[in-house]
Amino acid sequence: MLDCILALAVTAVERDWVEPELVHEPVLYVEAGRHPLAELCVETFVPNDSLMDFDNNQSTIQVLTGPNYSGKSVYLKQVALIVYLAHLGSWVPAKSCQVPLTFWNGQDLSACWPCVKGQSVPEN
């Protein structure tokens, strides 16, 4: 386990990750978030902002659309990984980040990862 913690710490320092702020408000905010693996596989990775506000106990649906190979799957997994890393206690690949303590975007983290080869993730 110590080797995993050390690997996260070294990666955080080398890749300019930031300490996420865990909050009790139902808002997820990520400024200039990056996918930790995808950014290593391309010459230029465009960071993405994310804002999901679940206030007032209302159901929220966000629809993510775009052409094939435009990065939709990478974006969804990026947000899921940032939330997951924050809950692990790790720093995250972003400029700044606020993560609610109880949040899950429903993305399956166990899906295969052909995105690093420029392919979309097939539906499960």
Model regions: which residues?
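Alpha-helical coupling/stalk and coiled-coil linker elements that connect catalytic or binding modules
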Residues: 1-70, 74-76, 80-104
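Flexible beta-alpha connector loops of hexameric P-loop NTPases
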Residues: 37-40, 65, 106-123
